[in-house]
Amino acid sequence: MPERERRKVLLIGWDGADWEHIHPLLDEGLMPNLEKLLERGVMGNLATLQPVLSPMLWNSIATGKLPDKHGVYGFMEPDPDNGGARPFSSLSRKCKAIWNILNQEGYRSNVVGWWASHPAEPINGAVVTNMFNQVQREPLRVPPGTVHPAERSDELGDLRVEPHELTAQDILPFIPKAGEIDQEKDPRLRAFVKVLSDCASTQAVVTQMMEDGEWDFTAVYFDTIDHFCHGFAEFHPPRQEHVEEETFELYKDVIRTAYRFHDIMLARQLELAGPDALVLLCSDHGFHSRHLRPRGTPREPAGPAVWHRDMGMFVMSGPGIRKDERVYGANLIDVTPTLLAAMGLPVGDDMDGRVLVDVFEKTPEIRTIPSWEEVPGDAGMHPPGTKIDSEWSERLTKQFVALGYVEDHSGNRDKAFESAETESDYNLARVYFSSRRYQEAIPLFEKLVERFPWEDRFIQHLIVALMRSGHSAQCLRLISAAYPGSWVPPNLAMTRVFAIQGAQGREAALQAFEAIPEQALAHPRMRRQVGTILSNLGRLEEAAVQLEQAVQDDTDDYAAMGELARVCLKQRRWEEAADRAMESVGRLHQQPTVHYTLGQALLRLGYPEQAAHAFEIALGMRPGMYGAHRHLSTLYAKQLNNPEGAARHHVAARELRKEQRERRASGTDDQRAKTWPLPEFPSPEERFATLKKERMSPEEQEQLKGSSGRSFTIVSGLPRSGTSLMMQMLDAAGLSPQTDGIRKADEDNPRGYWEWESIKSSEDLPELFNETEGLEERAIKVVSALVSSLPLEHSYRVIFMLRPLREVARSQSQMIARLRTTGSAQDEAALVEELKDHRERVLFHLKRQKNIKLLLVRFPHLVADPVAVCESVTEFLGEALPQPEALKSVIDPALYRQRSEGGSENENASGSEKE
């Protein structure tokens, strides 16, 4: 647009923010800055997409496209270069984000923290990626690709707020009783501080970037609300019955204070943007906070997403935007088209979103082009051949594992590759499924069911996709094969009734429905499905009762509202049908069947123009709706004086009718049965047993710990921390080592490494501990990176060696240099920080395990005062040590090389301690 029309545009993302949390705070006057924004603009719900996974959603927000077009299908993707898996990245995205489009038009942009934005794209402006929370400040270390331009890495990296820098003044507003928390048993405070420091870091960076340079567009993403909700929504008021009063009192204020903190940050962001800026604040989904909060997490990767609510929040404010108004029917794919229109730029016809014209005081001229992908010029994207930094990939993967979004396959690249490929296929299939492209979803679900016949989530999605696509007979065959008895899961019981109606008629469906146990239908989440079944079976009064209750349970349940509109239409309650349909599309616009219902109701009410508009909207989303074409043909011919439109829709209706007849005659179900033979399924009980084994719940993990009655002696620690010496000591004292002698003694370890090659893969540990004879009577050396993967069912006595980290780093570096392997040039100070973080995480884990007894042995004290340390080892191992007096016989101070100058971090600590 012309230079004189340019104004700053600020896009703010609050992941997981929900009006259900915000409205009470607004009513109490506790979010004054958001209140001011609302007074100057519009607000509304922002419908999410399926699956509700943040990397997919925020890239849809930034592109205006569904994930099958932008290419980000979840958290992890298969790594074709190195094997294994890597996080989805800016290189995974297949199309231009809004900042790439603006780059081509000469705009200057800031992008901070956006999902899958690493490595930073070379746009006109500045980018700080979602890798910024991995920055280390002491010493300063910014991962490559985190900041663009790279020369600003030190400047912006220095803004990183470390967790240890937060004080009680920062923490107590969120957790007033933080001082009462036993952090050895409760890890939540530690996790909370990490998330809060990340949030403060993002705010510091974005405000610095807004302050110190000319910019036209700034996009900033905060994950704090989402992370806090995943950690603490269970404790949000009102207290649930299963939540202990003491824990509730500790954490009940976290989420409320998080929103207030974001409101404080918002004030500074708005100040820097200026009064004439266009501001759009949104979230990608909501978060359950009331009676619909789940009691558990599904046994699947990305299981925590079950907490996500389908409605996020949306606020838009600035010159030309309506004031203090509500907007209905917005979807997160509408954000980019709306911003482009507001900036006077054309919208791509290939964008799945639409311009939210209702936000504007005066509807702007909406120009379109076929696709921004076809527009030449510098879009500030990575050149072909750009590679992913493997270190970044590994660090971010660990973060996803810690958050519960991906499975931990560290040490097994093949399994990591398979898991990433599986979840990407599953998520893509769900994109097709949720956008009603069942014929594209079905082959993906079929492939997944063939590979993983024990995964009910794949089986159930395939069953529903077959039913919705009209393959009723095949759907019933699949249900019978997967659930051979009379029992089926309650949600599939409804699907089975739908399929029976499609294959065998209404009477058979009615019998199947009446055979469903009443308790299976009583759950609030089942009311919508029950209402839909009753409507299909002609029991309209009962259907209306169920659907009304579903809407009362969840006032944003657009699907229940749409089905209720259909019931009202059948009951000839035209006005109520129109009202319910408008309420439904006001929450989610992309519902062609509900727009069709609205058109039917408006037609009955005597509004032909409005009815035609509703039918046209329905056809814009689903061109193959025979009824909409038929109605429009009649309306345009008889009431709206549009003979061309009438003829066009008449031809379309006739062609669709012909296709329907041909499809019925071709025997679609028989064809599908031939193309995809049903696999052999384990029984539901066997599938559940496999699922429990593959993905245990935290409660089951606790029950399993130590349950075998077997106990093992483990020596662990960082490489080069004294583990080999401890193995020698135990051998001298009569506790034989489990070693194969494959790794020979050398200059670095003249007396040998005392290692067991077979134990160097975490995937092999269960089999090794269960099948190796005599292992309980031996000492086993397990490196610190694997000690957290010990099989849960056994008990362990772990001797963990501690050595000053500077000594460990120097010893490792010199050993690597002598071996001439990779890594010898790594900065020692940076290595010390990495080792410190790793050791802290390992020890934190070990100290919290009820099946692990832990003895910490400090290497300098072992050499300086062997008698005292040997006494501690003797007491710790007890009868497992036949000749304890021989422990100190192998200690040779001459082998203590790479000593720290001027002492160490452990010099004031005792030589050993039990945990």
What function would you assign to each model-found segment?
Residues 11, 33, 257-298, 339:
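Metal-dependent active-site segment of extracytoplasmic phospho-/sulfohydrolases and closely related
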Residues 49, 124-131, 678-775, 889-899:
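PAPS-dependent sulfotransferase catalytic core
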Residues 65-246:
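His/Asp/Glu-rich, glycine-adjacent segments
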Residues 267-270, 296-346, 362:
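Substrate-binding rim/cap in mid-to-C-terminal beta-strand-loop elements of soluble/periplasmic
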Residues 276-319, 352, 368-372:
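Histidine-centered active-site microenvironments of extracellular/periplasmic hydrolases
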Residues 346-362, 742-750, 826, 830, ...:
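The conserved 3'-phosphoadenosine-5'-phosphosulfate
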Residues 779-882:
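PAPS-dependent sulfotransferase catalytic domain
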